[in-house]
């Protein structure tokens, strides 16, 4: 896949972890559109502001979808690569 090119996450580059905000979702990663379950990974000094904005812009995801998302994230990498 991708002619052998390997993805290098921005946050893994020296000096970038404290300057990177990673945003992801189950909808895109596992092809379950409409679930609206996602997350961010950010430095502590930024994540507080993200949580404040999130409180006013979104509603909570249904509990069964959160449980399904946790199960999907715990799946082996082989499951994910089969989706590609």
Residue spans for each PLM region:
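Conserved core segment of the aminotransferase class I/II
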Residues: 13-84
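Catalytic PLP-binding core of fold-type I/II PLP enzymes
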Residues: 1-6
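Rossmann-like dinucleotide-binding domain for NAD(H)/NADP(H)
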Residues: 8-12
